Amino acid sequence: PNDLVIDGRKLCGILAEAVSLGDQPAVVIGLGLNTSLTKDELPVPHATSLHLEGISYERNELAVRVLTALHHRLTQWETNDPTLMPDYRAVSATIGQNVRVILPNDTELLGTAEGVADDGRLQVRDQTGTLHELTAGDVTHLRLQ
């Protein structure tokens, strides 16, 4: 659930890692945005780029827009804005998808992503009907071959 996608194709990957700065928790956020890749340069067939989507941009303006949007969402998180999670769920490309999750203990969970809890936990129902609420793991959408 940490990718930005256009029509099912990955445009941007986002990584977040919790760290401790003394007694203050913090999160380090990194993002990789495919801006000018051509079809031949794509790392995987289910990726895309702003260039391939016909989206023109000026690099500095793009950076300002991304950082402004990130600041807005972080402010919503910090203030417990009740619209944040419904907004997120409305655009989630993961909810409703069959997924494979590699958990921190290297076990695999297969199931359907049913939702995201208000605290950000991904809700995955496995094949036995058990609902798992996950705080960490590597989530992959299962695609038909």
Segments predicted by a language model, with ranges:
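Long, positively charged amphipathic alpha-helical accessory segments at protein N-termini or as interdomain linkers
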Residues: 6-145
